[in-house]
Curated annotation (Swiss-Prot):
Keywords: Capsid protein, Host nucleus, Host-virus interaction, Viral genome packaging, Viral penetration into host nucleus, Viral release from host cell, Virion, Virus entry into host cell
Biased composition (Low complexity): 125-138
Organism this protein belongs to: Human herpesvirus 2 (strain HG52) (HHV-2)
UniProt record, GO biological process: symbiont entry into host cell; viral genome packaging; viral penetration into host nucleus
Name by which UniProt lists this protein: Capsid vertex component 2
Assembly and interaction partners: Heterodimerizes with CVC1. Interacts with major capsid protein/MCP and triplex capsid protein 1/TRX1 at the pentamer vertices. Interacts with the large tegument protein/LTP.
Pfam family, one: Herpes_UL25
Membership in a protein family: Belongs to the herpesviridae CVC2 protein family.
Interaction with major capsid protein/MCP: annotated span: 1-49
Region span, Disordered: 109-138
Compositionally biased intervals (Basic and acidic residues): 112-123
Function per UniProt: Capsid vertex-specific component that plays a role during viral DNA encapsidation, assuring correct genome cleavage and presumably stabilizing capsids that contain full-length viral genomes. Participates in the interaction between the capsid and the tegument through interaction with the large tegument protein/LTP.
Main location: virion
InterPro entries noted in UniProt: Herpes_UL25
Amino acid sequence: MDPYYPFDALDVWEHRRFIVADSRSFITPEFPRDFWMLPVFNIPRETAAERAAVLQAQRTAAAAALENAALQAAELPVDIERRIRPIEQQVHHIADALEALETAAAAAEEADAARDAEARGEGAADGAAPSPTAGPAAAEMEVQIVRNDPPLRYDTNLPVDLLHMVYAGRGAAGSSGVVFGTWYRTIQERTIADFPLTTRSADFRDGRMSKTFMTALVLSLQSCGRLYVGQRHYSAFECAVLCLYLLYRTTHESSPDRDRAPVAFGDLLARLPRYLARLAAVIGDESGRPQYRYRDDKLPKAQFAAAGGRYEHGALATHVVIATLVRHGVLPAAPGDVPRDTSTRVNPDDVAHRDDVNRAAAAFLARGHNLFLWEDQTLLRATANTITALAVLRRLLANGNVYADRLDNRLQLGMLIPGAVPAEAIARGASGLDSGAIKSGDNNLEALCVNYVLPLYQADPTVELTQLFPGLAALCLDAQAGRPLASTRRVVDMSSGARQAALVRLTALELINRTRTNTTPVGEIINAHDALGIQYEQGPGLLAQQARIGLASNTKRFATFNVGSDYDLLYFLCLGFIPQYLSVA
């Protein structure tokens, strides 16, 4: 018997072990006999009511799916626009970058044409009269900054063309004997220290003021008020002039010149000083101290343009210029302030949404495009900044005396242009105590608008205020440095231009791109420009809130820009610099 098998009767031994198969060898629990009778294996047949319920559930699910699909389809245009807008912005960035490169190429060509500028100066010395066949295009390139000076004719950019003449006039000494003030010297030294690559494209040897650097700096000053993101049919300067005229028209209905109302945009530019005076009077009549600031907590931190064309609600309404324009009906109510379904008692005939600026643009500019500033709040923000800067410009030029002693002027056109000062002209006017008796009012600004602003606008209708007055842009960028400290302690400022980091960066990028085969990415240039634009935006507000901003009360500050008289101030505002020659012997 094999001890491993309990069924010994089935064990057969024939020289091998062999176990016979038997049912008793299969050990398993007893299978339930009624297992296949359970209900789960015997489903009753579906009734008609149950089939109807299933069909109804299917129809309900299909209707819900169609409704969800309709909602998603309604959101598709918004989603598509949200995805396409960054692509459009990149395309605009590329177009603006190409335009900037074309401008840089034009500036480089002008730098190569310095000998031609010197030859033109020699031709003027020979007394060559202008050709009588000169057309209107040549007349548009002539401007007059000071009334007792002859007009200036330029090629493409007045400050850049004059810079070439300044360095060419120094002769053999080159840039070693040309200075512009400590402010420019500080910016140049900061640029060299922070961006050493700029030394490849500019000549900074022996501490000289580089002509290439000054050209790039002036172009940066001119660009800080421009909008490079987006495509617009109207400039911020045009919008500012239209708003000022509408405010004057609304608040000064008994004006003596109502019978001879302006018929063209040039008439508005000629009367710009009286519009600015009216703005100052309207703001002065308001109670409290005016606030020239936006809601910083509702604005993008490092971006000037508004995403989708609009900032957060209430971001711009705190600025006194915008509040004044809305209060007097020049601008309609801000989006969301007066809903469309408001009672007719609150908003009769939908007056709160009428936009007179759009109508004025059609009347004076007639470009076939609507102008609704609340729909493009980036342009509205730039417009308010332009109006504030114009108000500052009026205060800077108020009661200026350009007939004072000529030897007090740092800028002498006679050292650049032979015969610039006629021999019969009076070399000395009222100065010292006598100059205080002169009250010129807005005469200098009126002459500047007619003889300088209007020709430049006619030559380029897209021009912005900072392109017209780069010196004003420099003052606005330097406004924070000129703020008085609350403490009475005497502090010596050794910051070496740290406040102008944005200007230094943009100028350095302009210089570096001249020697690079792979230029700086467009996004980096836009970021640098936005940082400079945001800093410039704060300047007009700070200057507008100061009681005294003129030359008489800020001589030390203006001395850093090489400005020593009202005559210098006029040229500085228009050129962005005042050159002075030094002996290098």
